[in-house]
Amino acid sequence: MKLILLGAPGAGKGTQAQFICQKFGIPQISTGDMLRAAVKAGTPLGLEAKKVMDAGGLVSDDIIIGLVKERIAQADCANGFLFDGFPRTIPQAEAMKAAGVNLDFVVEIDVPDSAIVERMSGRRVHVASGRTYHVKFNPPKVAGKDDETGEDLIQRADDNEETVLKRLAVYHEQTEVLVGYYSNMAASGDKTAPTYVKIPGVGSVDGIRDAIFRALGA
């Protein structure tokens, strides 16, 4: 089972990725983890990536694709893998295809922007313990206070509405085009095309999980 999960920040990809990886016995692979592991191991690609990062640059798609090929050749990928946050752009998707990295499924978790803003801007955190709340979906017993300690809850900078809207704008501009790329590829009759699946991401976590499993034939 080789697949990628697409969806805006806050769509619930992280939660669903864990369910999928447990169900199919596959690793979740993120470019960040790959880069850190390669740099730590001192591989040729890792050293190349480190040079770029130390200079404050963006690691090229060529290096990323090289790392992907190295990573998926490892033993834990024998049954497949789930790409998290990769590919992000059409050039990356095309480079991956050219490198012979084929996928079985592309799963898009589709959540309206308004629901994502509500989800993320309503989050509140107790910094010391890491306990999280939501003003609507999981409110503390006393507004703005941690249930255990009574200490103040905060809204992380990442979760304020303005920041969420900016991140959504970047997603729509850069990554959402992949939705069209993969759905067109699937419709074109290309034999290497992955099956493209769109799952509504509003509802219970378990309901969304079950819909994804059905789509993946599990």
Swiss-Prot record:
It is found in: Cytoplasm. One of its GO terms (cellular component) is cytoplasm. GO terms for biological process: AMP salvage. Keywords: ATP-binding, Cytoplasm, Kinase, Nucleotide biosynthesis, Nucleotide-binding, Transferase. Pfam families: ADK, ADK_lid. Its main location: cytoplasm. Its EC number is 2.7.4.3. Residues 30-59 are annotated as: NMP. AMP binds at T31, R36, G57, L58, V59, G85, F86, P87, R88, Q92, R156, R167. PROSITE patterns: ADENYLATE_KINASE (PS00113). It catalyses: AMP + ATP = 2 ADP. Residues 122-159 are annotated as: LID. ATP binds at G10, A11, G12, K13, G14, T15, R123, T132, Y133, G203. Consists of three domains, a large central CORE domain and two small peripheral domains, NMPbind and LID, which undergo movements during catalysis. The LID domain closes over the site of phosphoryl transfer upon ATP binding. Assembling and dissambling the active center during each catalytic cycle provides an effective means to prevent ATP hydrolysis. Monomer. Catalyzes the reversible transfer of the terminal phosphate group between ATP and AMP. Plays an important role in cellular energy homeostasis and in adenine nucleotide metabolism. This is Adenylate kinase. It comes from Laribacter hongkongensis (strain HLHK9). The gene is adk.
